[in-house]
């Protein structure tokens, strides 16, 4: 009988785990990594050339994207091999038929996801968003934050006027008063915060942001390189270890590489918990499935999806994931 997509995925990800600590028999000629401004581990790894050191015979190329949906479009089109996004872009991509696999994750960053209003806004509670224009990147983690926040306030998605804009355009619309609120993530959040002109209506705490970033690979790439992905993550975790040991150094790296003011990067780091990359767990799949169901119930994706079809729990890439012990003020 011909193997199903789920069977192939299970076999592949089991193979990734089995080869987690083995050396690649043949490294690829090129490795194309998609990243965003908020991807500290990838930015630090790029600066320190951790992947280039680990794979000396491979040309490593980093490609920046403004948000997760654009990154996954490129991944599905074959323009990149692996990338990191928030929790929602993979749901939209799977619903659209993209041939992708969840291969790794970072912990949730609830302090780095917010809904902003201007400091003089009459909007003081989530319930006040009713009838208002809210800007955000469609299919992003901010989309999920907004949806959960509305539900928590007893509102439906249809109670607001969504304005779908990428981060830079959303910032312009927000600053010009063309929208009433803005759902966004760091470092865009920190850049707005430091102007002193915004008020945080809510962040991702209290169950509004229960998933972290995900690393996804194009399935053909992962199938061609079954022993490569765990080694990539082990190299990227060198960047996380460096950040934990010397946060000031990583702040300087982000400032130089991304062209952001140091104060913005320092603010982002203050919202960022320890973020080691680990393999997908059953809890990750459960959380993603609940979120996917929520989006389908609100008619935001065209069909129901089964997250387990493109992800399965595996043996940890390195050490067990650290528990986020950040204290809520």
Spell out what each predicted region is:
Residues 41-42, 109-115, 198-199, 211-215, ...:
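Small-molecule pocket liners
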Residues 1-11:
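Bacterial N-terminal signal peptides that target proteins for export
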Residues 88, 163, 168-256:
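Pocket-lining segment of extracytoplasmic ligand-binding domains
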Residues 9-20:
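Bacterial N-terminal signal peptides
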Residues 293-329:
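Conserved C-terminal helix/tail region of periplasmic/extracytoplasmic solute-binding proteins
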Residues 20, 24-28:
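Boundary at the C-terminal end of the N-terminal hydrophobic targeting segment
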Residues 27-153, 161-164, 180-184, 209:
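Short, glycine-/small- and polar/acidic-enriched structural segments
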Residues 223-300:
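Secondary-structure end/capping motifs
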């Amino acid at each position: 009988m011909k193997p199903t997509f789920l069977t192939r995925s299970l076999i592949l990800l089991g193979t990734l785990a089995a080869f987690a600590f083995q050396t690649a028999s043949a490294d690829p000629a090129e490795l194309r990594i998609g990243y965003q401004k908020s991807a500290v581990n990838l930015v630090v790894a790029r600066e320190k050339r951790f992947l280039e050191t680990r794979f000396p015979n491979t040309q490593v190329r980093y490609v920046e994207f403004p948000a997760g949906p654009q990154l996954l479009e490129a991944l599905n089109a074959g323009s990149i091999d692996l990338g990191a996004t928030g929790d929602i872009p993979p749901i939209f991509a799977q619903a659209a038929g993209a041939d992708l696999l969840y291969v790794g994750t970072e912990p949730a960053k609830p302090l780095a996801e917010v809904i902003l209003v201007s400091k003089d806004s009459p909007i003081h509670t989530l319930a006040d968003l009713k009838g208002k224009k809210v800007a955000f990147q469609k299919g992003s983690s901010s989309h999920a934050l907004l949806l959960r926040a509305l539900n928590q306030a007893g509102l439906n998605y249809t109670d607001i006027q969504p304005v779908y804009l990428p981060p830079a355009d959303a910032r312009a619309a927000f600053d010009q008063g063309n929208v009433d609120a803005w759902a966004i993530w760091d470092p865009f959040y920190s850049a707005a915060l430091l102007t002193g002109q915004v008020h945080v209506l809510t962040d991702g705490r209290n169950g509004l942001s229960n998933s972290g970033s995900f690393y996804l690979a194009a399935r053909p790439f992962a199938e061609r390189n079954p022993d490569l992905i765990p080694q990539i993550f082990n190299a990227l975790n060198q960047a996380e270890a460096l950040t934990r040991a010397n946060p000031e150094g990583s702040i300087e790296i982000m400032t130089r590489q991304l062209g952001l003011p140091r104060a913005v990067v320092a603010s982002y780091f203050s919202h960022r918990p320890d973020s080691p990359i680990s393999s997908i767990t059953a809890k990750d799949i459960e959380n993603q499935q609940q979120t996917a169901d929520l989006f389908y119930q609100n008619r935001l994706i065209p069909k129901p999806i089964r997250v387990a079809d493109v992800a399965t729990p595996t043996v940890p890439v390195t050490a067990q994931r650290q528990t986020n012990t950040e204290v809520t003020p």
